[in-house]
């Protein structure tokens, strides 16, 4: 038996094991408001089985990135947004981390994302501690 509920402290069952404080979110390359072939939006398709994401992760930059219209759509649906910046080039100096943080902040400001909102960065195995420090402090 598998059951999932909202991430508001409700108990979910996975197999026979109870899981409390389950937080479900989505990280998608596709906009939440894109219409699919079944005439549902991506968000509607995700929630069709009563699984409601607490957050929807979307890239601030790159192809098909987050838009103001999608922000409004998610806001009206009661879903928080995890804004993700995807850096390019080498990620090995504190200066580059600070530059990427500044670029991420500019993109967020352009979308009217509040200044106190967290902006995540996509990471892989090439970032250095110095880069991440620069990004966090930037």
Where does each model-flagged region fall?
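Non-catalytic propeptide/linker segments at domain boundaries
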Residues: 1, 5-13
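Substrate-binding cleft of extracellular glycoside hydrolase catalytic domains
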Residues: 15-38, 50-134
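Acidic, glycine-rich loop-and-strand cores that form catalytic or ligand-binding grooves
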Residues: 137
């Amino acid at each position: 038996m598998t059951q999932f509920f909202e991430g508001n402290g409700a108990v979910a069952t996975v197999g026979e094991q109870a899981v409390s404080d389950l937080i479900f979110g989505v990280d998608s390359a596709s906009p939440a408001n894109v219409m699919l072939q079944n005439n549902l939006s991506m968000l509607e398709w995700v929630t069709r089985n009563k699984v409601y994401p607490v957050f929807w992760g979307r890239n601030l930059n790159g192809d098909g990135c987050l838009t103001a219209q999608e922000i409004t759509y998610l806001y009206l649906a009661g879903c928080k947004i995890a804004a993700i910046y995807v850096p390019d080039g080498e990620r090995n100096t504190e200066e580059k981390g600070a530059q990427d943080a500044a670029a991420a902040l500019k993109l967020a400001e352009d979308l009217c994302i509040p200044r106190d909102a967290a902006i995540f960065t996509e990471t892989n195995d090439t970032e250095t501690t110095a880069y991440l420090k620069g990004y966090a402090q930037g």
